[in-house]
């Protein structure tokens, strides 16, 4: 059966038009004009539903508000975009967006002490407790993206001129968080296998002590880096940090929400996760978890008093700027959470799917994987300079021929025009889709007469 994506969106939007009638009406019910509008819209909806059950082809949907394209890549395509794969909303999260899309929708029943993590209806307070338990830490807060978690910790721990140890694969937001606090990043080099080791971290710490005369203020390290998606020895690195009495921040932007993370077993003082990258949540969303030892500092409450009014806001947490996610982002994050918890237990299967695809890609002569292999993550960096890029050199569309071929097979998310080094993720795809994806790549290779190896 042909997909009826446009009709599904048309029906959803028509239901919203019907919903608007309810919003415009009095609490006592619909007046005569509203009843007529209801009947008219319902008739239009029934026509759309009939089209859903027919083979007829209808016109494409109009744009939202006249200018915004309908985003249907998750319905119509296999999306391998690395930063989108684990952020796809669950069904329950999409329902939450519908019900809680209005501005401060979390605040309907906010009561004293007037703080987000204390709200009981919806159960936001309980969610904060569950988040901390999820990563085996003592306390947690939701934040507008992992970057705000980095920022909160850096502003707490780093003074002007302090050094902060980071990976040479560190994300730019880690740099900015340190810079904003007045600190200076000091990068640990990767080894020949593109891995950050505990020994290299210890050497860097010693270098900093020798040069500055004092310990770094913080060690901030990615478990899985975003550049080549290798797994780094965060447990060993945390142990080294603590040997020097330096607090350790675990960057779980590519782990929290997709694979099991035990903050205390790792030795983390702070765990930062990304909701929109790895927890099936809308952007911006994320989490910061910490221990009871560090919570009084990073979650400190304001002590400031107004000089004229004597006002004070004692329950508001300074680094959080008070409340953080006050609407549908948070509720969708909460709605996805049961499924997110469950899917972390299937991580081994996700890794198997990643290796299935990479194994298929490597049968195409000249293709390489730049990430550690066998894969330990669903995100991979590959090099097709010796395969698909050879075709690009003589093709009239250059590297865009490859995007054309993938798109024709219903695959999107690769960096358009890239045929040399690029990244993709198989996370969240069913086995049926992973097999289809692997077959599509070998089909394209065969079409352009690129030699294939036999599978081992």
Swiss-Prot record:
Catalysis: reaction(s): O-phospho-L-seryl-tRNA(Cys) + hydrogen sulfide + H(+) = L-cysteinyl-tRNA(Cys) + phosphate
Gene3D superfamilies reported in the protein's UniProt record: Aspartate Aminotransferase, domain 1, Type I PLP-dependent aspartate aminotransferase-like (Major domain)
Record-listed N6-(pyridoxal phosphate)lysine modification sites: 277
Binding site residues for pyridoxal 5'-phosphate: 146-147, 251, 274-276
GO BP: translation
Family matches, as Pfam families: SepSecS
Cofactor(s) required for function per UniProt: pyridoxal 5'-phosphate
Catalytic class of the enzyme: transferase
EC number: 2.5.1.73
Keyword line: Protein biosynthesis, Pyridoxal phosphate, Transferase
UniProt GO MF annotations: Sep-tRNA:Cys-tRNA synthase activity
UniProt keyword Cytoplasm, yes or no: no
Disulfide bond among keywords: no
Subunit structure, as described in the record: Homodimer. Interacts with SepRS.
UniProt record similarity statement: Belongs to the SepCysS family.
Job description of the protein: Converts O-phospho-L-seryl-tRNA(Cys) (Sep-tRNA(Cys)) to L-cysteinyl-tRNA(Cys) (Cys-tRNA(Cys)).
Protein's recorded name: O-phospho-L-seryl-tRNA:Cys-tRNA synthase 2
Organism: Methanospirillum hungatei JF-1 (strain ATCC 27890 / DSM 864 / NBRC 100397 / JF-1)
